[in-house]
Amino acid sequence: MTQHSPAFVTPDWLEREQLTDTPTPVFFGWLFNQQSLTRRLDRLSDGGFDIVPLSEGWQALRDDECAALGLPAASEGWVREVYLRGNGENWVFARSVAARDALQHGGLHMDELGTRSLGALLFSDPAFDRGTLQVCHYPQSWLPDADAVSGLWARRSQFSRGALSVLVAEVFLPALWNAIHNKDHA
């Protein structure tokens, strides 16, 4: 489970039009691509893609997550944190959350995913609508210790189906950018 730092100010999640600190064109293309990240990573890794679960369970959601899901502060939800890996390297840290009430009545069993991709599940169900992508520099204190680096770009979006909403945040780790660079220059 990632660290909680109550003294840390919640980052500003910004939509494309609100960005003043614009990432490079390659970063921008990955951050705002609407396709399944799982599929893109699988292609980039030439089939060497896998998921490593880090933690999952019921816990109090972060303030920014509650606000995005329209919940009261400190609402409880299911939190799933995983690495999306390519060829044995951690490429993306992902944190997915859903409110307890919505999840228990929404027919999505996040607790049964194991090493399966939540993204693949969400993109295979046409009833899920994806909200607007937002980006930020993800707080270092919210990352697993092994990848706790400041200034990493992250994106998040909300997937909704009826009363069920799942907020998915994806932090792009340095090894991913290295893999993209190496593939572009191969």
UniProtKB/Swiss-Prot annotation:
Pfam families xref list: Chor_lyase
Entry-linked InterPro entries: Chorismate--pyruvate_lyase, Chorismate_lyase_/UTRA_dom_sf
Compartments in which it is found: Cytoplasm
Keyword Cytoplasm assigned: yes
Gene Ontology molecular functions: chorismate lyase activity
GO BP annotations, alphabetical order: pyruvate biosynthetic process; ubiquinone biosynthetic process
EC number(s) per entry: 4.1.3.40
Keywords for the protein's UniProt record, in alphabetical order: Cytoplasm, Lyase, Pyruvate, Ubiquinone biosynthesis
Catalytic reaction list: chorismate = 4-hydroxybenzoate + pyruvate
Residues that coordinate or bind substrate: 80, 118, 170
SUPFAM superfamilies: Chorismate lyase-like (SSF64288)
Known pathway: Cofactor biosynthesis; ubiquinone biosynthesis
Entry GO terms, CC: cytosol
Enzyme class: lyase
Function: Removes the pyruvyl group from chorismate, with concomitant aromatization of the ring, to provide 4-hydroxybenzoate (4HB) for the ubiquinone pathway.
Family statement: Belongs to the UbiC family.
Listed name of the protein: Probable chorismate pyruvate-lyase
Organism expressing this protein natively: Pseudomonas syringae pv. tomato (strain ATCC BAA-871 / DC3000)
Lineage: Bacteria, Pseudomonadati, Pseudomonadota, Gammaproteobacteria, Pseudomonadales
